[in-house]
Amino acid sequence: MRYTFVLGNAPSQKRFIDIRMQPSIGCNFAIKDHKLTHLIVADRMAVHEVRKLPTRTETKYWCKASPLETPPGWHDLEFPGLDSGSAALALAAELYPNNEIIAIGFDGVLGLSDENAYEYAFRPNPKPEQIRARHRATVEQIYPDLPRTRFVSYQSDPVLETISYDQALKIAITQSRSLYQEPYQA
C-alpha cells in the first residue's frame, strides 16, 4: 500500500518535521517545516507571505486566488468553496487516487485544538469555533469521495477514521525508507 501525506495547519503536524514524506501535500505555511511535493495556499494574504519564503524547486505550488493573481510558476487550484485543508485532501485524491491518505495536522476538524496560527492570525473574525465547524462540515462532505483517509489523532472520531500518532509515524518512516529502494509510481 502506498500513502499520500496531507499536512493541515495545526501545530501537531510539526511532530513529523524530520521525516521525508513523499508524496506530500501541505497547506499554507507547512512549507516552512516540511519538504513537500505540493503546497496549497488558501488566499491572497497567504500567497503574498509564502512568496517571501525561498522557493523550493521540488515543490509544485498551487493557489486558490484568481488567475489574474496567480504568481508566475504557480498552478490554479480548481476546488471552489473548499478551505486549504479540504482542498489538499481533494487534490491528494485527484493526483494519487490509488494511495491511502494520511491526514496530519487537522486538529481543529477533529475538535482537538484551538490552535491554528495561520487561520486565526489573518482572520480574527469569525470566531474559531465557527471556522472549525465550517471546516469540519466541508471535510465530512468530501470524505465519502476520498480514497481511504485516516486522520492522525490521539482519540477516535464518530465519523472520520483515525490513526494514532505512533502508527502514522511508523507508516511515514517505512514509506520514506522504501523511497530509496524503488522508484515511486502513482
How would you describe each model-predicted region?
Residues 1-186:
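Metal-ion/cofactor- or nucleotide/acyl-coenzyme-handling active-site neighborhoods
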